[in-house]
Amino acid sequence: MEMWVLGEVGMAVLSAAAMADWVSYYRGDGPDEEEDGEQQEEEGPEAVADYRFSGRDSLIFLVDASKAMFEPYENEEAATPFDMTMQCIRNVYTSKIISSDKDLLSVVFYGMENNKNSADFKHIYVLQELDNPGAKRILELDQYRGDEGRVLFRETFGHNADYSLGEALWACSNLFSDVRVRLSHKRIMLFTNEDNPHANDSAKAKLARTRAGDLRDTGIILDLMHLKKPGGFDISLFYRDIINVAEDEDLGIQPDESGKLEHLMKKVRAKETRKRALSRLNLYLNKDLSFSVGVYNLIQKAYKPYPVKLYRETNEPVKTKTRVFNGKTGSLLLPSDTKRAQTYGNRQIAMEKEETEEVKRFDSPGLFLIGFKPLSMLKQHHHIRPSQFMYPEESLVTGSTTLFNALLMKCLEKEVMALCRYIARRNTPPRIVALIPQEEEVDEQKVQIAPPGFHIIFLPYADDKRNVDFTEKVPANREQVDKMKGIIQKLRFKYRTDSFENPVLQQHFRNLEALALDMLEPEQAEDLTMPKTEEMSRRLGNLVEEFKQLVYPPDYSPEGKAAKRKQAGDAQAEKRPKIEISEDSLRSYVQNGTLGKLTVSALKDTCRHYGLRSGGKKQELIDALTEYFSGR
């Protein structure tokens, strides 16, 4: 099938309508403010990008502490809105300790009798200043949970409805200003079940709107985490003019009020973890038309946090520094004293740093449209590495969202994918990628579960394809196939990625939490990957036995060990493996320095054939063969 060039689909990007993330919050979310620098990406099928960002995240939990927040839900197992809020904040604290302990968190109450803040505003109490999360801070939050916590809170702080939300926002702004370190993101999360706090005081309502506008102008994001209340929570009464709505969100879609911890945590995590672009670049539809996009990881493998080296005498963190010395004289070498070299034809070819950078530079970063193909032409075996996600970046080029939406809608309508040449950043080789369109999805509470945009699927080069020799198997007959179909049908279930947690990671995090909070023993993580054998047996009934009778011989015993079949000529088996490469070809490879073109398997067989050591890395095999043939 011929490739479509930029025709009807491409021209449709000139007219469009507007449009509306979830990311993993483990590892790599909280670097030091000193760690400035460009984002860098590892290449390769198993590579996971490791990026550095300047500044720290900061988050203030602004909690309504009025009496209404302490009234229990009717016919609900959950306690009060305040209890649910404190549990949610505690969960964020523990996750931050694990994933990004350099971030700054704070808890501020309003609507109470007592007050404690730098400006001495009435009925506003700063429980915790902006600081790193830690065990002591979590234990302090735990004091105010449950029935005993509510009693302690009432006795310690009391309640008073004569507060000013504008002054509460002002107090939060002062907390950000008092921080000495550099802040990359500043966010306030407001927890309340009161949808019109200043219904009878227009002056306070006006002050709150003014302060919210000031926060917006200074780059502070205000998010509303509204909680369930009798009669429902109406955002339009007051908070629609107060809260921030991100540029990539639909003004008409707001999440429903939260009456359960699970729903509240889902909203908080979606807001708390900022959308970090792996790169921001242009997508060129042709040489004269382009728009800017951001590239993101929707899913990234979670790792255990890196261990920190400590000095054994004081338990203080230590920093590792690397120095390069001359092997002959022992003198210290500066970066300008070293070069990179490539062995080719038994010669070391040295290159300057500028030359190596020039060799790696193919073109300027960006996505360059090649054409369009039907979605049906993308096959499962084209997968070569994890995909990325593309979303418009309006802040760089005005009008990018409009062009992006037009392209997305037209690709969805025609069921096509866009093929592009993709260079993520300088000094990375180009890749051929497919842009797969995706519609936006929201759940019953109008929380986004799938963002609109394009998945970037990396396609293999011709060099990446392998020819695998498959041994011929005994084909199954129709009766055996039908019986297996029945087994598969009985064991089918709806798969959801968020239903299975990594048991090793979960247990590791629980162990860390137990150590940090001085627990007697860590909570045991449930391994959700273990098959439910009893449920499977109940579903299958006699199908397994019937399948065994169809496939295995009558005297088959699964516990018995299969006897090794002896073949004629085993005693005369060759000790050395046969190799398909002639000695002359090997000499040519050695002389030209091109042994690296051979696979590791071929190199190992060749080494064994000539009685050389066949273990170790590929370079060691190449060195052994080079030394062997150079001496003959």
Swiss-Prot record:
Keyword vocabulary terms for this entry: Activator, ATP-binding, Chromosome, DNA damage, DNA recombination, DNA repair, DNA-binding, Helicase, Hydrolase, Lyase, Multifunctional enzyme, Nucleotide-binding, Nucleus, Phosphoprotein, Transcription, Transcription regulation
Pfam families: Ku, Ku_C, Ku_N, SAP
Ranges of residues in domain SAP: 595-629
Domain called Ku: residue spans: 283-490
Keyword Transport applies: no
One example GO MF annotation: damaged DNA binding
Record's function text: Single-stranded DNA-dependent ATP-dependent helicase that plays a key role in DNA non-homologous end joining (NHEJ) by recruiting DNA-PK to DNA. Required for double-strand break repair and V(D)J recombination. Also has a role in chromosome translocation. Has a role in chromosome translocation. The DNA helicase II complex binds preferentially to fork-like ends of double-stranded DNA in a cell cycle-dependent manner. It works in the 3'-5' direction.
Subunit structure as annotated in this protein's UniProt entry: Heterodimer composed of XRCC5/Ku80 and XRCC6/Ku70. Component of the core long-range non-homologous end joining (NHEJ) complex (also named DNA-PK complex) composed of PRKDC, LIG4, XRCC4, XRCC6/Ku70, XRCC5/Ku86 and NHEJ1/XLF. Additional component of the NHEJ complex includes PAXX. Following autophosphorylation, PRKDC dissociates from DNA, leading to formation of the short-range NHEJ complex, composed of LIG4, XRCC4, XRCC6/Ku70, XRCC5/Ku86 and NHEJ1/XLF.
Keyword flag Nucleotide-binding: yes
Name of the protein: X-ray repair cross-complementing protein 5
Post-translational modification: Phosphorylated on serine residues.
EC number: 3.6.4.-, 4.2.99.-
Region ranges (Disordered): 555-578
Gene3D superfamilies, A to Z: 1.10.1600.10, 2.40.290.10, Ku70, bridge and pillars, SAP domain, von Willebrand factor, type A domain
Gene Ontology biological-process annotations: cellular response to gamma radiation; DNA recombination; double-strand break repair via nonhomologous end joining; negative regulation of DNA-templated transcription; telomere maintenance
